[in-house]
Design a protein with these regions (language model features):
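Iron-associated oxidoreductase/ferritin-like identity signal
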Residues: 1-204
């Protein structure tokens, strides 16, 4: 017997049960899609692209470059993970890169002036902190209501928290001469993304 609360009709391809069930549990799906697009733009346009430039300018610090590369590639992995979820929910990406960039939930991590190591590490740290806040918000609104999005967001959040710890360690050492251990090492493989990654993207 069909559930009386059922909205999607037999054979109907204009609606999605995957949306129906989370809407019934209180998820504002249009708002969630908007938030996911903002986070996708932040992961790809605000961080992955600009982290490429920041990494290049960490001149003379190969160890710092490796950590930045891990964060850069993992942000790309996050982008790859978010996009399918946007479409599953019935959303879509803007068909214009500038329009997409302008929706980013975090400020673009543009090369600072002057591009000193301390300024770059500070920018990297604050970018990761913005990501943590953004993903925590999505975890909050999907917990107990949308397990698919919550699982994805919590996996990404785990890695963003690790990234923050990395850049705290590096910045404290470089700027303040202090030891504030992150509690873990760089990845075994660049961009390994142990919590979120679904395929390899390393392209040196």
């Amino acid at each position: 017997m069909a559930d009386k609360k059922q909205v999607v009709k037999y054979g109907d391809v204009s609606q999605r049960v995957g949306v129906e069930v989370i809407s019934a549990r209180g998820v504002d799906v249009p708002k969630l899609i908007k938030m996911l697009i903002a986070n996708a733009a932040a992961e790809f346009a605000s961080t992955y692209y600009y982290y490429t430039i920041l990494r290049m300018h960490l001149a003379g610090h190969e160890d710092y470059k490796e950590i930045c590369e891990d964060a850069r590639l993992e942000d790309r992995a996050h982008w790859e993970l978010i996009v399918p979820r946007i479409y599953e929910l019935g959303g879509e990406l803007p068909n214009d890169l500038k329009a997409f960039h302008d929706q980013a939930g975090c400020v673009a991590a543009k090369l600072p002036d002057p591009p000193t190591t301390v300024n770059i590490l500070t920018l990297l740290l604050e970018s990761e902190r913005c990501a943590i806040r953004s993903w925590m918000e999505i975890c909050d609104i999907t917990f107990g209501k949308d397990p698919r999005t919550y699982d994805m967001a919590s996996r990404i959040l785990n890695e963003e928290i690790e990234h923050e710890a990395w850049f705290i360690e590096l910045l404290a050492h470089e700027r303040d001469g202090k030891s504030i251990p992150s509690g873990h090492f760089r990845r075994g493989t660049p961009g390994e993304a142990p919590y979120s990654k679904n395929s390899h993207f390393y392209n040196p």
